[in-house]
């Protein structure tokens, strides 16, 4: 069978949900028994997002092979069975880097290197490489049609249609149909202009996903179809929903998968969406509520913690609970009234981050959770700060710190990875990707996983200093997870506590709605057991509120 491609583009404005659309289409095709690949092209000049500010880019999603990628790859993995690699996310910067390397090596034999054909060929070759193992490859093009940065990618997919034919390629365009309250009507002009822009570069969309807050009536669909040169069935209502996990069901109801398969000349079984439907049912009919306070450095932009939030949702759904998240600015907890800000939460979580800003506030939050027996979950920096707090306030090691925050600290509880000593480059130099971990029998971690050998994804430059292991474990801290060779400490716990666990890795990157991560499930369960009284909850299944912005 020839390789089949679905290209997902966006128009009018950014942040319309191209990534969720691609993931949802992948979910539906998998439910029909097809093997699905997904990839994203990002038009920025950074080689990868690893050194980009979370406030600009959002979360950096890490794959098993250690690639630092766009957060949309997290959606791809959560909605499908795909396990992605660095080949599934390419940027303009990385493509240009590859081309310049080839040019310096003499691969182009003296030719003038140009956007067409050299850049577009590199893009097409990347798509073919990913498509080699699968039935359908879904390719998301980052940015918005009309952006100068996206033009080489759009030209590449235009050429793919020419080379492979209509029966092997489908163009899905995500656009906006806004409701204008003053006029009390839906406006189609933004969509018409977006499609006109696509046509100007030689691409006729086959399917339009129209983002809107209500179902599109027949007359609106008919109007869009007429002016955008496609059949009315191909004008899809991409309606706003309270839970992102409802999107595949909305698309199935609108017939997106059937339409794409008809265009691709593919026959499949009927989709089995029973588990997905049951998941959405739990989203909207929780039996209780759990409140989690997340103490972070980048809480002003929730996309900085996209996978983290979703992993908590997965844990809550596994228990049939509504999740209420409160985002707490870590610096705000450096004030004397920090205990007042932290009271009332069923659980406290400190996620990853870099730099010393807000660390003292995190330490206050950890102390509060430890002393008041509030379930605590620390991830990456959250584990490191838990060790520092324990060293200071339980072991009495005054001035204990990380060399990242205080190079002159008398007690380096956390220090730079030994193999990174003398390394000055920032990009791609951390301990990245999947690493094995061995758990102690009888520990919280082993009980949660149900086994003692695991593999988790990492992204860090600093590690626990094992010179302090005897002091901390002698005072009651338990090291329950290490690398197989015992080089790195991966998990710490406090046994004399309802739930207190810190891990050096990022478990959120492997959590899925139908397969919640064991540590998030265990944490949410412990937090709910700490919740008094157990009140009935109402939809939606997850809410967010900020503190200290």
UniProtKB/Swiss-Prot annotation:
Residues binding Mg(2+), per UniProt: 72, 140
Activity regulation statement: Allosterically activated by GTP, when glutamine is the substrate; GTP has no effect on the reaction when ammonia is the substrate. The allosteric effector GTP functions by stabilizing the protein conformation that binds the tetrahedral intermediate(s) formed during glutamine hydrolysis. Inhibited by the product CTP, via allosteric rather than competitive inhibition.
Swiss-Prot/TrEMBL keywords: ATP-binding, Glutamine amidotransferase, Ligase, Magnesium, Metal-binding, Nucleotide-binding, Pyrimidine biosynthesis
InterPro entries: Class_I_gatase-like (IPR029062), CTP_synthase (IPR004468), CTP_synthase_N (IPR017456), GATASE (IPR017926), GATase1_CTP_Synthase (IPR033828), P-loop_NTPase (IPR027417)
Protein residues bound to ATP: 15-20, 72, 239-241
Span list, region Amidoligase domain: 1-266
Assigned GO CC terms: cytosol
Catalytic activity: UTP + L-glutamine + ATP + H2O = CTP + L-glutamate + ADP + phosphate + 2 H(+); L-glutamine + H2O = L-glutamate + NH4(+); UTP + NH4(+) + ATP = CTP + ADP + phosphate + 2 H(+)
SUPFAM superfamilies hit by this protein: Class I glutamine amidotransferase-like, P-loop containing nucleoside triphosphate hydrolases
Residues at which UTP binds: 14, 187-192, 223
Record carries keyword Metal-binding: yes
EC nos: 6.3.4.2
Record-listed L-glutamine binding positions: 353, 381-384, 404, 461
Additional observations: CTPSs have evolved a hybrid strategy for distinguishing between UTP and CTP. The overlapping regions of the product feedback inhibitory and substrate sites recognize a common feature in both compounds, the triphosphate moiety. To differentiate isosteric substrate and product pyrimidine rings, an additional pocket far from the expected kinase/ligase catalytic site, specifically recognizes the cytosine and ribose portions of the product inhibitor.
Subunit annotation: Homotetramer.
The protein, known as: CTP synthase
């Amino acid at each position: 069978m020839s390789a089949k491609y679905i290209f997902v583009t966006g128009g009018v404005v950014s942040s319309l949900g191209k990534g969720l659309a691609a993931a949802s289409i992948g979910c539906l095709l998998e439910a029909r028994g097809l093997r699905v690949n997904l990839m994203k092209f990002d038009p920025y000049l950074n080689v990868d997002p690893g050194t980009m500010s979370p406030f600009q880019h959002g979360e950096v999603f890490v794959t098993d092979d250690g690639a630092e990628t766009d957060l949309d790859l997290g959606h791809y993995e959560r909605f499908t069975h795909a396990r992605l690699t660095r080949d599934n996310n390419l940027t303009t910067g990385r493509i240009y880097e590859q081309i310049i390397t080839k040019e310096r090596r003499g691969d182009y034999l003296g030719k003038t290197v140009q956007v067409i054909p050299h850049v577009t060929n590199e893009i097409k070759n990347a798509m073919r490489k990913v498509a080699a193992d699968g039935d359908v490859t879904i390719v998301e093009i980052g940015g918005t049609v009309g952006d100068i940065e996206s033009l080489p990618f759009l030209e590449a997919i235009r050429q793919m249609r020419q080379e492979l034919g209509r029966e092997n390629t489908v163009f899905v365009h995500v656009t906006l149909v806004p409701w204008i309250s003053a006029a009390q009507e839906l406006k189609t002009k933004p969509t018409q202009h977006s499609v006109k822009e696509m046509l100007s570069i030689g691409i006729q969309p086959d399917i339009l996903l129209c983002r809107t807050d209500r179902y599109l009536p027949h007359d609106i669909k008919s109007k869009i179809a007429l002016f955008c040169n496609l059949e009315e069935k191909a004008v899809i209502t991409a309606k706003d929903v309270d839970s992102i996990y409802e999107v595949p069901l909305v698309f199935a109801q609108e017939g997106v998968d059937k339409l794409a398969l008809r265009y691709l000349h593919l026959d499949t079984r009927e989709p089995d969406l029973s588990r997905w439907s049951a998941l959405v049912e739990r989203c909207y009919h929780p039996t209780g509520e759990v409140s989690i306070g997340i103490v972070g450095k980048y809480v002003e932009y929730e996309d900085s913690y996209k996978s983290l939030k979703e992993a908590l949702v997965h844990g809550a759904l596994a228990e049939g609970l509504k999740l209420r998240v409160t985002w707490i600015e870590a610096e705000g907890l450096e004030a004397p009234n920090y205990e007042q800000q932290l009271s009332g939460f069923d659980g406290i979580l400190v996620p990853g981050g870099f730099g010393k800003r807000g660390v003292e506030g995190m330490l206050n939050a950890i102390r509060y959770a430890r002393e008041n027996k509030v379930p605590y979950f620390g991830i990456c920096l959250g584990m490191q700060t838990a060790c520092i707090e324990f060293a200071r306030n339980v072991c009495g090691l005054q001035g204990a710190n990380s060399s990242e925050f205080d190079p002159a600290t008398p007690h380096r509880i956390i220090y730079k990875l030994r193999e990174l000593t003398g390394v000055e480059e920032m990009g791609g130099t951390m301990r990245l990707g999947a690493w094995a971990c061995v758990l102690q029998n009888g520990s919280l971690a082993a009980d949660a996983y149900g086994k003692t050998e695991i593999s988790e994804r990492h992204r860090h430059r600093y590690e626990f200093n094992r010179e302090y292991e005897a002091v901390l474990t002698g005072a009651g801290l338990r090291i329950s997870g290490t690398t197989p060779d015992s080089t790195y400490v991966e998990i710490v716990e406090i046994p004399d506590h309802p739930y207190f666990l810190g891990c050096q890795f990022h478990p959120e990157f492997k959590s899925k709605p139908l397969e919640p991560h064991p540590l998030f499930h265990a944490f949410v369960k412990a937090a709910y057991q700490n919740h008094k009284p157990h009140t009935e909850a109402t939809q939606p299944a997850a809410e967010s509120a900020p503190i200290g912005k």
